[in-house]
């Protein structure tokens, strides 16, 4: 079901063209009225984030051209509208397509503020290294900030507690299908042993900023850490196996049933 919201989003213009007949027309001077209507509609499908823009052009109660964002271009409804549709597709098509966001989505978020758009979605933050290399080699840290709403967000990089401003770059905000956003903020750096890099994220959904750390360490240190984790996992497995065997051995073999039960 499509929800039509003309009160705030419908910008309809009705132009009444009054054409006076020539003085020589029988019956004297009389007025002839021609009505040209321009009707844009924004549709929002209930329970989804789908938006549709439809613009109708009507002359004397007859629609002759239509733009539908689902189609993506102006289409002539009658032969009268064919020249206009061809011209508008050449001159104004990109601007009209953009109005799905600049008009419909923008006004819906700013004026209607429906329950689905009042929500605050907290971002997820993950740090990754673009290339696996040893210390003291140029590299790039990537802070992936995903699934947040609204779009306003501030992401900063810190090295050992000091904000980094050189070598920082960012993608544009990427809109997800559910209206949440994601962004990648990169930091070009040369990691040295003991350095701590922090991705600092501020967002309206957060009571306090999210901070995620990445520590520079050598391959040998990383290998030792992984070996330690693997040793702990194996230790837990063998401990559980030993307890299981001990529990089974304490039960002992079952003896024969009492003699009275065999009679």
Swiss-Prot record:
The keyword rRNA-binding does not apply. Keywords: Adaptive immunity, Disulfide bond, Glycoprotein, Immunity, Membrane, MHC II, Signal, Transmembrane, Transmembrane helix, Ubl conjugation. The chain crosses the membrane at residues 225-245. InterPro entries: Ig-like_dom (IPR007110), Ig-like_dom_sf (IPR036179), Ig-like_fold (IPR013783), Ig/MHC_CS (IPR003006), Ig_C1-set (IPR003597), MHC/Immunoglobulin (IPR050160), MHC_I/II-like_Ag-recog (IPR011162), MHC_II_a/b_N (IPR014745). The keyword Ribonucleoprotein does not apply. One of its GO terms (molecular function) is peptide antigen binding. One of its GO terms (biological process) is antigen processing and presentation of exogenous peptide antigen via MHC class II. PANTHER family: HLA CLASS II HISTOCOMPATIBILITY ANTIGEN, DQ BETA 1 CHAIN, MHC CLASS II-RELATED. This is H-2 class II histocompatibility antigen, A-K beta chain.
């Amino acid at each position: 079901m499509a929800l039509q919201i003309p009160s705030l989003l419908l910008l309809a213009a009705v132009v009444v063209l009054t054409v006076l007949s020539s003085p020589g027309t029988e019956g004297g001077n009389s007025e002839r009225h021609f009505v040209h209507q321009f009707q844009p509609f924004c549709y929002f499908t209930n329970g989804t984030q789908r938006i549709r823009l439809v613009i109708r052009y009507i002359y004397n109660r007859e629609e002759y051209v239509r733009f539908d964002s689902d189609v993506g271009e102006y289409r002539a409804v009658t032969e009268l509208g064919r020249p206009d549709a061809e011209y508008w597709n050449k001159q104004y098509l990109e601007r009209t397509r953009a109005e799905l966001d600049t008009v419909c989505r923008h006004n819906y978020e700013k004026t209607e503020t429906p329950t689905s758009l009042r929500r605050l979605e907290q971002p997820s933050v993950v740090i990754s290294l673009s290339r696996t290399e040893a210390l003291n080699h140029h590299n790039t840290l990537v802070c992936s900030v995903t699934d947040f709403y609204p779009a306003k967000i501030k992401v900063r990089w810190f090295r050992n507690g000091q904000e980094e401003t050189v070598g920082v770059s960012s993608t544009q905000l990427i809109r997800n299908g559910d209206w949440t956003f994601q962004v990648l903020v990169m930091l070009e750096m040369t990691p040295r042993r003991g350095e701590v890099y922090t991705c600092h994220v501020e967002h309206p959904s957060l009571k306090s900023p999210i901070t995620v750390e990445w520590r520079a360490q050598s391959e040998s240190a990383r290998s030792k850490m992984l070996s330690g984790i693997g040793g702990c996992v194996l230790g837990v497995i063998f401990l559980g196996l030993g307890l299981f065997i001990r529990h089974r051995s304490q039960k002992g073999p079952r003896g024969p049933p009492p003699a009275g039960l065999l009679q």
